Amino acid sequence: MRWIGVPDVWDAREADPGFMASLATFAVLGLGLDLVVDGTVLTLTGTVPTLYPLGWQAVVWAGLGILWWFTARALVLWSRRRGVDPLPSGTPDGRDDAALDHRAWRTVLGCAVGGVVVAIVLPALLGVPGLAPVERFATLYEAYGAASWVAVLAWLVRLVGRCAVLASILAYAHRAVLGVVTLRGARWVPWGGLVLGAVTGAVALLSRGPAVALSTLVVCTLLGVVHVRGGESLRITAPFTLLAFAVL
């Protein structure tokens, strides 16, 4: 993230830690949109199926992905209105992304690859059989047959939107904590990854068990390192978040 100056509008004022925490909170609340859908279906029908009929399932997943994408975009615009750009084209010292030194890129790529490996290997080591993406596709194929590709495309739209919000939580939470913690070297601690890991890990613990919850925490911490070493830019953090959560 980079300070870009407060725009010349009547109600403009600089962002503070409380504002950044508010953005992170709104992003967390935005993740609950799927619960709103399930809750509505439960109220109307008295039950929530694992999978809806193909047409409705595709509409739900694609709709959620689009809503999440616009939520993340709205948070970016809101942040810029308060003088902070979460999508800078360069690093905090003014260099372009392409000019990041090889050590920073080596750390970014190493942590990103490590996150993917952890997402695949750690659940298996802790007793969770199978690979999540393969099992997901097998479930969709069993339910929808040859038309399962429609559901897969809708799920990918959902994944992109959801990961945009997850990366937003990480970025804004990191900046909020940095505004409060002033210890020497605090800027190198992956605060955003720890916060995101706590949030998504708690959800994973309730829905998928402790093995996936631990894997989620480790993966999010590594994504936090990616965010720090990548200049705190969502341009770098968001794609790697998508890559990691695609296999988690």
Residue positions per predicted region:
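Transmembrane alpha-helix/helix-exit interface in multi-pass inner-membrane proteins
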Residues: 113-135, 155-171, 175
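Short aromatic-rich membrane-water interface segments that cap or initiate transmembrane helices
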Residues: 51-57, 142-157
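Helix-boundary and loop/linker segments of multi-pass membrane transporters
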Residues: 12-16, 100-101, 140-148, 182-189
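N-terminal juxtamembrane cytosolic/stromal segments of multi-pass membrane proteins
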Residues: 1-24, 79-97
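Aromatic-anchored segments of alpha-helical transmembrane domains
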Residues: 28-39, 116-124, 196-206, 241-248
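Non-cytosolic membrane-interface motifs at loop->transmembrane helix junctions
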Residues: 48-56, 137-141, 212-223
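Alpha-helical transmembrane segments in multi-pass membrane proteins
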Residues: 16-86, 106-115
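Transmembrane helix-loop-helix hairpins at the membrane interface
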Residues: 148-248
